Regions:
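Nucleotide-activated sugar donor-binding and catalytic core shared by glycosyltransferases
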Residues: 1-348
């Protein structure tokens, strides 16, 4: 297995030829990455000209992966997209391009299989590695080690440095407003890794708000600990969904990205649990270019009404139902192996 990727692929046993970018782009900000994407595609193509490839597995990021997949198909390589490109949210006109550069699409969201099949793209729903990952048995015990408080609020500012820079000030302002209304409030901020924790500390400086505790890792225990999460839009919202914890979702963007997203996105909901539910079960501000007021007000509306909190929990549990019984790693591996053997990758 040869990869362009990061350390987790290397840990899994892949030979990493070149490390891909750690910091992604969303919306119109991706335009700045066009040159890097082209260089990336050319480097992969040069490598493939000297090596025989059985199956190419592009993961997510259609802007980066479509050019590579197109070159692979020209070389006669079978292509299996792992993580369906979200053409249902934006860019349905790119379906013809997808049909030309894939043999099958493995979907992480339940509705995607039918959506793609209805448009003549071979697809299968395989579950989601976040939702179908079992919680460790000691998760609740670890959560009990965190500070007591009422309410307990979790801040999740993102897994990329660009997300943290944009969203951290907004989340801190929202937290400050909530602290002024709840004297016993305690908060955790979870940084995805040590580098991002250092970034958070540098942004906050010496004035860490009273009642805010900064940690890295141990996301599951932090979610189990909290009453409510303020989280950046993205996969982390599924980590919160997996434990059915009420949340408010936000994604701070520039004015250009905000108005561009309004033009390009075709779905009313952008936060993953709302997309999965097909309705607004979580307050979301995605994309958002305003201040913290609507964010903390949405959080306060939930915290002030236990019936709303219970309804949010029940709705999130409902979102999890289609995932029961799936093993995304096993199902993806079997589809890729079938494709490598020249068989139908979507057969049972």
């Amino acid at each position: 297995m040869i990869a362009w990727g990061g350390p987790k692929l290397a840990e899994a046993g892949a030979t990493v030829i070149e490390r891909s970018a750690d910091d992604g782009a969303m919306g119109l900000s991706a335009i700045s990455r066009i040159g890097a994407v082209r260089r990336h595609a050319a480097a992969i193509d040069r490598w493939c000209s000297q090596h025989r490839v059985a199956v190419h597995v592009p993961v997510d990021s259609p802007a980066a992966n479509f050019p590579v997949a197109k070159r692979m198909k020209r070389r006669g390589v079978r292509v299996c997209h792992l993580v369906a490109p979200q053409l249902w949210a934006w860019g349905p006109w790119r379906l013809n391009k997808l049909r030309r550069c894939t043999d099958c699409v493995l979907c992480l969201l339940p509705f995607e299989e039918k959506w793609f099949r209805d448009r003549q793209v071979p697809a299968r729903f395989i579950g989601h590695p976040v939702i179908n990952r079992p919680l460790a048995e000691d998760t609740v015990a670890r959560a009990a080690e965190y500070p007591a408080g009422s309410p307990k609020v979790l801040l999740l500012p993102g897994s990329r440095s660009s997300e943290v820079r944009r969203n951290l000030p907004l989340l801190l302002r929202a937290l400050s407003e909530m602290q002024s209304r709840h004297r016993r409030l305690n908060a955790l901020l979870v940084a995805a890794n040590a580098e991002l924790l250092q970034l958070v500390r540098s942004r906050i400086g010496d004035s860490v708000p009273s009642g805010l505790h900064l940690i890295t890792g141990d996301l599951d225990a932090a979610i189990a600990w909290c009453d409510l999460a303020l989280c950046v839009s993205g996969t982390v919202s599924l980590d919160v969904t997996r434990q059915a914890k009420p949340m408010v979702g936000v994604y701070k963007v520039s004015p250009l990205s905000y108005f561009g997203s309004r033009l390009l996105l075709t779905t009313p909901n952008r936060l993953l649990p709302n997309i999965l539910a097909g309705r607004r079960i979580v307050p979301e501000f995605v994309p958002h270019m305003g201040g913290a007021e609507p964010v903390w007000q949405a959080a306060e509306t939930l915290l002030a009404d236990q019936a709303r909190m219970r309804a949010a929990t029940d709705a999130l549990r409902g979102v999890l139902e289609p995932y029961r019984g799936h093993d995304p790693a096993e199902e993806a591996a079997q589809a890729i192996l079938r494709l490598a053997r020249g068989e139908n990758p979507l057969s049972s």
